[in-house]
C-alpha cells in the first residue's frame, strides 16, 4: 500500500481482486457516463472490466494498477503505464495515465487532484517529460479537471469497440 496523503492510499490490484474491481466499476461508471451509451455503459464496463481484460492489464509490463483508498474505503481505481508513447509526440520518456475513476460520493474532495499531483511528482522524480491521457470531451467535469491542471489537448480520437 502506498500512502500519498494521510487519507489517501493506493492499494495494488491483484488477480484475486477482479470481482471487487468489476463491482466497483458498476457503481462508478454508469452514473457518470450512462448518457453516452445506448446501453447505459454496460458494453464499456463489460469490455474493459472483463476478467480477461483485467488480467491482461495486470500483466502488462511497466503498468501499475491500484485501488484508490480514501478514509479506509476503496472508492476508485487508478492505472498508469510507464513508457507508453502517444503517437505524434517526440519526447522520449512518456507515461500514460490510463485510468482514474472515483466514486461519485468522493468527487470534489481533492482525491483526484491529490492522485494526479502524486503521479506528476513521480514522473518528475523518474525524469519523465510527458504525462498523457485520454479524456472524453463530452464528460465536461473530467475534461475541465485536466485542463485546469495544465494538460493540453493533443488530438481527437474515437473509441473503436468492433
Residue positions per predicted region:
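Residues forming the Rossmann-fold NAD(P)(H) cofactor-binding site
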Residues: 113
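Flexible nucleotide-binding loop
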Residues: 109
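Acetyl-CoA-dependent GNAT
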Residues: 3-8, 12-18, 22-105, 116-118, ...
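Conserved GNAT acetyl-CoA-binding A-motif
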Residues: 116, 123-135
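Short glycine/proline-centered loop/turn elements that form peptide/ligand docking sites
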Residues: 116, 138-142, 158-162
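Conserved catalytic-core motifs of GNAT/GCN5-like acyltransferases
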Residues: 134-135, 147-162
